[in-house]
Amino acid sequence: NNSTIAGQIAAGNVNLCTTLVTIMHDLFVDSTFNSNIGFWDTSNVTSMNNLFKYARQFNQDIGGWDISKVTSFSATFMAANNFNQDISNWDTSSLTNMYSMFREAGDFNQDIGGWDTSNVSSMDSAFLSATDFNQDLTGWCVSNFSSEPSNFSNNALLTSTNKPLWGTCAPSVTLTDTDSNNIVTGSNVVTITATFDRSMAATPTINIIGEVSNVAMTASSTAAVWIY
């Protein structure tokens, strides 16, 4: 639990049942730790502030962690120079604080463009001096920010074309189709429906590799539902 996990780690034990842990602050700060902890149960953790701060050797797969309750990632990977693992599938819907999250994380350059940032209210210095990071963040929901946060990506590789579109929230879309078995023969006609979370002001286009490129979809009953 919260009162014993730090002591267990200090004693060299990481084979822990972490189900009761809700706070994971500072556990590996300024350490040489680099052991597998991808199996930890983080489903009840709400804060991971400074978790790997200055943990310059850590580079383990933690992409399977359930972080759906985590609200704060303040300085979680700050100066964790070696970390570059795929965490694209993390459920960040509860996240509110990304202050200095990847600050000085020199090697990190993973695709996190699909993260849900709709509840985030702090992104100051999130990628400050993250010298390798240059992923497309234009799909992030950043309606809580009227302008770029302070030092968001100063001295980082992130280009202006990959930065979030401040003050906007990209629409989400669900795709469904009429092909039940994923096998299409020459005589089959498959209908693909795109359902957006809001009405679209412009006509969406669809790309299917090897089949169609930027083909306009057809409006359905509302401007939020489109068909191809």
Predicted regions: what is each one?
Residues 1-170:
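Negatively charged
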Residues 170-228:
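Non-catalytic beta-sheet/beta-sandwich ligand-binding modules that flank or precede catalytic cores
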